[in-house]
Amino acid sequence: MKDSKELKIMTVDDAVAQIEDNMVLGIGTGSTIELLIPKLAERIHKEQLNITGVCTSNKSAFIAKKLDINVVDINDVGHVDLAIDGADEVDVNINLIKGGGGALFREKVIDEMAHRFVVLADESKLVNYLGESFKLPVEVDKFNWFHIAKKIEAFDDIITERRMSDDVPFITDNGNYILDCQLNKQIDPYQFHEYLIHLTGVLETGYFLNITDQVIVGTQDGVKIINKSN
């Protein structure tokens, strides 16, 4: 039986094959993307492709630059042709929960800009509904994080935790906290997102709704492609 890393590796080649010369490419964040970036660099240099990368996190930018991928600031490009990223959950409508790596705001900016957004995932990420197995990350301002948490908990039997890293609060690339929200039952993601995004101090939620074009899934039986239904 293949482990999670092996399943992720299976998805990478299909994603790299979608790269074309002269693209502005959105490069995501997380363990799957860290497997993708070296393969991406290999193809760019082997075929001498002109690729401009915009990265969803400082970590991804560091890795890409180290492999001599041309990386620029998001404000230096007018569009993104293709964005490739991972996901923490994928539901039956290929809506997502993202943000396990703490980069959800920048991920959403780039993924929404992209003409085409492709997600890489192993089969363990496929769920019946969002929040079934992974906590929903919400990026919040440090100033009033505790009060935001209480308002989130008041919504509908939700448990929040401020994300920690090495016994100190995790800080995003934007200088904010992450609240991880445990949903104890199925909740309408559109309704909950609207509630959250209007709370003062909330920067963004980990719901990625109606923006995914394709999911490449690594399974024990091979690669499965799920395309957005028209």
Swiss-Prot record:
Pfam families, per the entry: Rib_5-P_isom_A
Q: How does it assemble?
A: Homodimer.
Q: Which GO terms describe its biological process?
A: D-ribose metabolic process; pentose-phosphate shunt, non-oxidative branch
What EC number(s) does its UniProt record assign?
A: 5.3.1.6
Gene3D superfamilies reported for this sequence? 3.30.70.260, 3.40.50.1360
Described by its record, this protein's role is as follows: Catalyzes the reversible conversion of ribose-5-phosphate to ribulose 5-phosphate.
Checking PANTHER family in the record gives: RIBOSE-5-PHOSPHATE ISOMERASE
Q: Which GO terms describe its molecular function?
A: ribose-5-phosphate isomerase activity
- Top enzyme category: isomerase
Family of the protein in this entry: Belongs to the ribose 5-phosphate isomerase family.
CC terms in the record's Gene Ontology section = cytosol
Q: Report the transmembrane regions from the record.
A: none
The cross-references to InterPro entries, in alphabetical order and at most eight, read: NagB/RpiA_transferase-like, Ribose5P_isomerase_typA_subgr, Ribose5P_isomerase_type_A
Give the residues annotated as active site.
E107
Q: Which organism is it from?
A: Staphylococcus haemolyticus (strain JCSC1435)
Reactions that this protein is recorded to catalyse? aldehydo-D-ribose 5-phosphate = D-ribulose 5-phosphate
The protein depicted here goes by the name Ribose-5-phosphate isomerase A
Residues that hold substrate according to the record: T29, G30, S31, T32, D85, G86, A87, D88, K98, G99, G100, G101, K125
Which keywords has UniProt assigned to this entry?
A: Isomerase
Report if keyword Isomerase is assigned.
Answer: yes
Pathway, according to UniProt?
A: Carbohydrate degradation; pentose phosphate pathway; D-ribose 5-phosphate from D-ribulose 5-phosphate (non-oxidative stage): step 1/1
